[in-house]
Amino acid sequence: MDEFKVTPWDVEGLVDYNKLIEEFGTSPLTDELLEKTAQLTKSELPLYFRRRFFFSHRDYDKVLQDYESGKGFFLYTGRGPSGPMHIGHIIPFFATKWLQEKFGVNLYIQITDDEKFLFKDKLTFEDTKYWAYQNILDIIAVGFDPDRTFIFQDSEFTKIYEMAIPIAKKINFSMAKAVFGFTEQSKIGMIFYPAIQAAPTFFEKKRCLIPAAIDQDPYWRLQRDFAESLGYYKTAAIHSKFVPGLMGLEGKMSASKPETAIYLTDDPEEVGRKIWKYALTGGRATAKEQREKGGEPEKCVVFKWLEIFFEEDDKKLMERYHACKNGELLCGQCKRYLIKKVQEFLKEHQKKRKEAEKKVEKFKYTGELAREQWDKAVPEALKG
């Protein structure tokens, strides 16, 4: 197995997810936990759980226990608005929507326009505010409940700073440095930022569940060190794998490599061009050789995208897998199938994105949960 690297800022190599569970000290998302989820929600699990796109967790078992006992829980996730969103960014939001809908819980979505300004030297504050609005449209298009979802932008929801101050008092520099690798060159705003990122985990006196990619896990380790000293729960998390870019299974889809990504605003022609030109397949050198030896779907980005999100039907996915292995299916056929699936998804998403322009105010300011948060006092435990 080649070496791989996973940090909150960078993912390189072909990730060994079992090894990553050991390195990060998380727990595998077991059959028992998924069966319990299906039982409590009285629902069939979505493909991102069935196919183990979400594979790891911290205290998800306790979240389910809290729900079953009547204590409940709440959801928290976010988006750093440094540019347009792509397929890899949006899939965890669909999993979050399923959890909100099936468990009937509140959801807080933090838009970290301040963080991206601090961490990205080339971005102005106006840039991150612009992308915040654009990204919010994509997030609303997923279909969250507007009265149980609060989307807040750090630069606007300044109450979060008042909550972050006592949190920052719990974190010394050596703790932050150990988790985030800060150096003498790190901006002082970057060093303080983990306190702001932790603040939403204290929005309710319940356990917080964060659905996110595994590379974001370090942000919540610090919270778990001090949460109980403030009279709150350690935050829980469920972790997803990475959506690979078009050019290979190593690393993850990246906005810094536009040819590897399908953006949520791409038009049908661009989708077709990118997938046809750049998508790595598990095919052989010639069609004749592929018919004789069969393809290698386990090495194929096209198959991986279908597995992660674009083929809902488990039976059809396995039929495609075996047809490829048996040499009955050629790469061009699979690429055309994926192109059609992605185009259909984006057509619907872009329609909902346009409709979202009229819903921004409700999610940020006037919905039931939004109004409650704007009006609510800072919890006593977080007043220092």
From Swiss-Prot:
CDD domains assigned: TrpRS_core (cd00806)
Keywords associated with the record: Aminoacyl-tRNA synthetase, ATP-binding, Cytoplasm, Ligase, Nucleotide-binding, Protein biosynthesis
Catalytic activity, as annotated: tRNA(Trp) + L-tryptophan + ATP = L-tryptophyl-tRNA(Trp) + AMP + diphosphate + H(+)
GO BP term, example: tryptophanyl-tRNA aminoacylation
Signal peptide (residue range): none
Record-level Gene Ontology MF annotations: ATP binding; tryptophan-tRNA ligase activity
Residues spanned by motif 'HIGH' region: 81-89
EC numbers on record: 6.1.1.2
Main location: cytoplasm
Entry-linked InterPro entries: aa-tRNA-synth_I_CS, aa-tRNA-synth_Ic, Rossmann-like_a/b/a_fold, Trp-tRNA-ligase, Tryptophan-tRNA-ligase_arc
Subcellular location: Cytoplasm
Locus of motif 'KMSKS' region: 252-256
Gene Ontology CC: one annotated term: cytoplasm
Top EC category: ligase
HAMAP family hit by this protein: Trp_tRNA_synth_A
Similarity remark: Belongs to the class-I aminoacyl-tRNA synthetase family.
Protein name in the entry: Tryptophan--tRNA ligase
Organism: Thermococcus onnurineus (strain NA1)
Phylogenetic classification of the source organism: Archaea, Methanobacteriati, Methanobacteriota, Thermococci, Thermococcales
